[in-house]
A protein has these predicted regions:
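N-terminal secretory signal peptides and thylakoid transit peptides that target proteins
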Residues: 1-15
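Pocket-lining segment of extracytoplasmic ligand-binding domains
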Residues: 137, 149-250
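Short loop->beta-strand "edge-of-pocket" segments that line small-molecule binding or catalytic clefts
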Residues: 40-47, 144-160
């Protein structure tokens, strides 16, 4: 379990792409919460490009529809904020957040409740923020990159913005003055592509292991070559991303949703494995206290912005 001092060493709706699961179990269409929720919307932050997320989640959406006995629609948001706002206005019932985007929702009073996260294949429950450079570049450390171009992911990305900013602050670096240009690329895939195309000189990304990272997924899809990139920095462990449902949903609906997630690795192994290219072991129950260190991180990042303004 993480504590506040372990995280990071010291402190640690917009346009969408929709996919609907239609294979409903007749027996499951019983009266109760399903009458109030004839459709559930699962909103996912765009860690990769929309088509990739849609392909990854399609079988899982079908499984959820069947298990829950109500139509489940997938929404892949254009940016992280769209998922936050979707839960704020009640149009997204279940959200697949990053830790920081969930924390941003909490800080801005969205009534959302994390119920599970993923366990990695090695049993750990976390991942890392890394900085990549091109392998053919001369850069070895952040010190070598003054005046160069930095590629981040999204203002509400944990490993793609907030943790990198925290780490740079520890080095007494203000990104907007240290680097020639800071670009939000929109997704982890886009950050790597920007580095590949030499639009940026260094890019932030998520990484779990050599076999499990955004870069390894891009390699598997033929979008990048592993040997073209080199890691120059890695953060301390960050809690894995949460799934969260609306706080005001009925208790029996919440229980049914968690049960469907919990049983997915055995009841729908192919669909479950597709979510992570087979790199995750299971879903694990969590609650809001698990992400309190990340909420504190977001408050810290906000305080830095206020100081600079």
């Amino acid at each position: 379990m993480f504590n506040r001092r372990q995280i990071l060493g010291t402190a640690f709706a917009a346009g969408t792409v929709a996919l609907t699961g239609t294979a409903l179990s007749g027996a499951a269409r019983a009266a109760g919460w399903r009458d109030k929720y004839p459709e559930l919307v699962l909103g996912i932050v765009p860690a990769e490009n929309a088509s990739g997320v849609t392909d990854r989640y399609a079988p899982f959406v079908e499984y959820l529809s069947k298990e829950l006995g109500t139509k489940v629609t997938l929404r892949v948001a254009n940016d992280y904020a769209a998922v936050i706002e979707g839960q704020r206005n009640g149009s997204i019932h279940i959200a697949g957040y990053g830790p920081a985007s969930y924390a941003r929702a909490v800080v801005t009073d969205v009534k959302t409740e994390p119920f599970c996260t993923t366990v990695n294949s090695d049993g750990t429950i976390g991942y890392y923020s890394v900085f990549y450079v091109r392998n053919d570049s001369p850069y070895k450390t952040i010190d070598d990159l003054k005046g160069k171009n930095l590629g981040l992911v999204d203002p509400n990305s944990t490993s793609g913005n907030n943790v990198p900013r925290f780490l740079l602050n520890k080095l007494k670096i203000v990104p907007e003055t240290y680097f020639s240009h800071v670009t939000y690329t929109g997704s982890h895939e886009n950050a790597v592509l920007a580095l590949q195309q030499k639009t940026v000189d260094v890019a932030a990304n998520w990484w779990n292991s050599e076999e499990d990272s955004n870069l390894s997924r891009m390699v598997n899809k033929g979008l990048a070559k592993k040997d073209d990139f080199r890691m120059i920095s890695k953060s301390d462990l960050i809690p894995n991303s949460p799934y969260a449902y609306l706080t005001d949903m009925p208790a029996d609906a919440k229980a049914a949703i968690w049960k469907a997630f919990e049983e997915a690795p055995t009841k729908a192994k192919v669909a479950y494995d597709k979510l992570s290219d087979g790199k995750d072991r299971e879903f694990k129950a969590v609650n809001a206290s698990y992400y309190e260190p990340v909420v504190e991180l977001i408050k810290f990042i906000d305080s830095l912005r206020k100081q600079k303004s």
